[in-house]
């Protein structure tokens, strides 16, 4: 989950649907999402709710995301919402956030990444 804060409530609904269908769901958020309180919600509350839904700690740092590749932790990585900033970083191989590191680490195993862009660019 990236910092498209106005879409977090819809992303959380989707997370609940994913968790209802799959036993093991690992939540991953950008550092900014993990720390920023906005008019759309409190970061601490969002992290707590993600842990409740997934029954798994939230990955929110590059260091925590790095083992995803070597340990082959995921079958599918969903980035929802994916900001334009994160999308640009992914397109250019920039891995300076927990989400972009998770994607790079996951892709190195030839496994799929599903991206749900959320931008206000039209």
Each predicted region: which residue ranges?
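A cross-family phosphate/adenosyl-ligand binding-site feature
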Residues: 1-122
